[in-house]
Amino acid sequence: GLWSTIKQKGKEAAIAAAKAAGQAVLNSASEAL
């Protein structure tokens, strides 16, 4: 139903945000070295 679609989109968005945050941390860490 609609609710499961919303939950799925939210999960995908959360995963994408976590990946982007992790990439930003890696980038800043490599620049600091």
Curated annotation (Swiss-Prot):
Record keyword Chaperone present: no
Modification sites for Leucine amide: 33
| Key words of the record | Amidation, Amphibian defense peptide, Antimicrobial, Secreted
Which residue stretches, if any, does this entry annotate as coiled coil? none
One GO biological process this protein is involved in is: defense response
Main localization category = secreted
Which Pfam family is one of this chain's hits?
Answer: DD_K
Is Metal-binding set as a keyword in this record? no
Task: Identify one Gene Ontology CC term for this UniProt entry.
Answer: extracellular region
| Reported function | Has antimicrobial activity.
Q: What is this protein called?
A: Dermaseptin-H8
Organism from which the protein derives: Pithecopus hypochondrialis
